[in-house]
Regions:
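Non-transmembrane, aqueous-exposed alpha-helical and coiled segments at domain scale
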Residues: 1-374
């Protein structure tokens, strides 16, 4: 293979962005210039969503208006609810998320309008409605009635309310908020680049986000948090962890939740999420997965010099919160919609069709032989 070919676009800078900056050399991630860790400690998710979409943190008046807009758009159409009821209960929620956003695109009167203001309005609608759609399916597949959102609740509180019919204590809601903030944006990852590529053809925001959701579903991207939990469930208890991870490494199995294409000495989001994983484990009085976490992490670092990524602590945190494992990546979706939307709008603002080249390595020119002579 020629040195000119960069498989996976590794190391290739394809564009500029003002949205986020990943700095592996100093183990840092910023959104619009603000450190993600600082945003986690000082802001709620709605504030960070506003920042990503509008370039600045909101003041009290702006935040109140933003929440009002979300509240206005949070309900689903009767048509979408009807479709959700017809979806097979064994469908993966990521496929449901993709379908729901597609339907939103069919229903949105501004679908064809790619102006900045229209795209922002559509982004807010998708951001508000997607959690409602996912929570509705969460209950429908269990044979339960859909729970309507309540205006008095925050973004995170409403999601718990719509899924479980109750809101947990503030510490768990804060942990969920933190996970959403850490998942909200991460520069030109696979799903974001997918969204920008679709946008570069001047397609609409619903189509771009639908494509991004399909990309995020893969276990090498967003689906890793689900795979982490499947791994921990296989291990079952801390006493099995060392034997399990030793065997996995001997067999050269892929250990999900470890390694990153950008971070090589540790994901900057992990320490913050690890702390909230610990807090949730204490509240739930369940330290089994935390102990498994520590044993597997220690072996991976010592034996392979590979560090965990943010999916590693997030998976068991969502499990302790009560979410089904196949809902972990959809939670990622409801957060990352903010980042995708910002990138879609940024792509429109200075667009150029994304069209890379390929180095052909197939057969040389061949003469076509008639069918009866082959």
């Amino acid at each position: 293979m020629s040195d000119d070919i960069k498989k996976g676009l590794l190391g290739i800078i394809v564009d500029e962005t003002e949205i986020s900056k990943v700095m592996p050399e100093i183990n840092s991630l910023t959104y619009r210039g603000y450190a993600a860790q600082d945003l986690c400690s000082r802001c709620n998710f709605e504030e960070v969503a506003y920042l990503i979409l509008n370039k600045e943190l909101p003041n009290k008046k702006q935040l109140k208006e933003f929440k009002k807009e979300l509240s206005k758009e949070i309900t689903l159409s009767k048509n979408l609810i009807s479709i959700l009821k017809k979806i097979p209960k064994n469908s993966h929620p990521m496929d449901v998320a993709r379908t729901a956003v597609s339907v939103m695109g069919l229903e949105d009167k501004e679908t064809k309008d790619n102006s900045p203001k229209a795209n922002l309005r559509k982004a807010i609608r998708i951001f508000a409605k997607t959690p409602t759609a996912l929570a509705a399916f969460y209950r429908l597949r269990k044979g339960k009635k859909i729970i309507a959102p309540k205006k008095k609740f925050s973004f995170s509180e409403n999601f718990f309310h719509m899924c479980f019919g109750k809101v947990p204590n503030k510490e768990i809601v804060k942990a969920f908020d933190v996970s959403l903030i850490l998942y909200a944006e991460h520069s030109f990852n696979v799903s974001t680049f997918t969204a920008r590529t679709i946008t570069s053809s001047l397609s609409d925001i619903h189509g771009a986000i639908t494509g991004a959701i399909a990309s995020l579903k893969g276990p090498l991207h967003g689906g890793a948090n689900e795979e982490v939990m499947h791994m921990m469930k296989k291990i079952k208890k801390p006493e099995n962890a060392l034997k399990w991870i030793t065997k996995a490494l001997k067999n050269k199995d892929v250990v999900m939740g470890f390694g990153h294409r950008v971070y090589k000495s540790g994901d900057s989001r992990v320490p913050t999420m690890r702390e909230y994983f610990k807090r949730v484990a204490i509240i739930k009085k369940d330290k089994i997965f935390e102990k498994i976490y520590d044993i597997v992490e220690k072996v991976m670092i010592e034996e392979k010099n590979i560090y965990p990524n943010v999916d590693y602590p997030t998976g068991p945190t969502y499990h302790l919160m009560g979410f089904d494992t196949d809902f972990f990546t959809p939670i990622f979706v409801i957060s990352r919609i903010t980042g995708w939307s910002a990138h879609i709008m940024e792509q429109h603002a200075a667009n150029k069709l994304i069209r890379p080249l390929a180095s052909y390595k197939g057969s040389k020119h061949r003469k076509v032989i008639q069918l009866n002579q082959r």
